[in-house]
Structures are given as C-alpha cells and as structure tokens.
C-alpha cells in the first residue's frame, strides 16, 4: 500500500483483518486513505463511519456518510445506501436532532424496507418520545419476526406495547428479552420492572429495578421507583 495506495485488493484484505479484530484505529487508518485513493468504493466509507461511531466522533460519522451518498450510482447496492442513511439517523439522534433523524430513517427504509437496525432504532426512539406508536409497533414487529431471539429487538417491542398500555403482551416479550440475554443491560432490566409493576407484580418489579440499579443506572426516576416501590413515569416528551 505504501508503494501503491490504490491497491484495493490489498487494502480490502487488511481491512477484513482489522474488522475481524475490531481494531477501530486500524480501520480508520485504512479507510481514511481508502476514500482518498478509491473515492467510489463505498465499503471504505461504511467501515469508516462505523469506526467513527465507535470513537464517538458523531460529526465525522455524519460527514463521511454524507460524502458517501454523493458517490452513490444507479448500480450501487440499495442495502448499502440504506445503511448509510441509518447511520445518519443514529448520528442525528445522538445530536438530539430528532426530525432530521426520522427523515434519515425514512430514507433508509425507502432503499431497504427490511433494514432491521433502522427499523428497530426508529421504532424505539418514537416510543421514547411516545409518538406515532402504531407505526413504531409495526416497524418493531418486523424486527422480532426477522430475529425472534434478539433481546434488543424483543425489548423494543415490549417497550412499545408497554407505552401503548398492552401490559400483558409486553410482559411476554420482555420475559423473552431477558431469557435471550443472560447479561441484560440496565435499560432492559428497568423496562422489565416497569412492565412487571403494571401487570400487578410489584415484588418482581422491585427485583428488576434493583438489578438495574446494580448495573449502574443512577437515574432519579429509578431511585424513586425503588424507594416508593411503585412505577413512576419518566416521560421525556408528552404524548402527541
């Protein structure tokens, strides 16, 4: 590569190895040079965006995806274009630019209606804002059908059902989420507690809230739930 930076085959081989080893610094080095020497190779932009995300360089991830989209051609893989829009959606959401995020997810789903990651994140963020819940449920259900053992997707679907007031059904899915991930995150554990409380199991709720606390969740709302032994709503946005 030092002699011939445009040697795509060599760069792709090295990139494959770096991706396998999750060496994000090396991925950045290879892809930053790759987008210069092969500006039409969308793979370099894609892995560079992922590496920037890992490094929490949100603005750089956003910029490289937008640059990639300017190199999209008629014969570019629609799934790859969709992934760029999904990463843009995630980046905008990180920056609290929700309208821009949702527009990007919409674009992602135009290019690939089965983009599972975009469907899940879009659905979950809508549920957190308590808006467009029917749309959120529909999108989330597709992810659960596609990957019925994925605890992240099961949690999203359970949470949407909870927000809609379908507590008994929500409990079925949150139980599956917990069952499929022995090391559940504090968010999933807190969701589980909330759902258990609303299905009349205050004791089970308290158990899961305490587990969420032990996992490092230090939110005031969770603290109050544990102290008062009851569900307290943490609405980030009123229902629309």
Where are these regions (language model features)?
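Canonical tetratricopeptide repeat
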Residues: 13-14, 47, 87, 121, ...
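Structural marker of alpha-solenoid helical repeat scaffolds
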Residues: 3, 37, 71, 75-77, ...
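Position-specific recognition of the canonical hydrophobic site in helix A of tetratricopeptide repeat
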Residues: 19, 53, 86, 93, ...
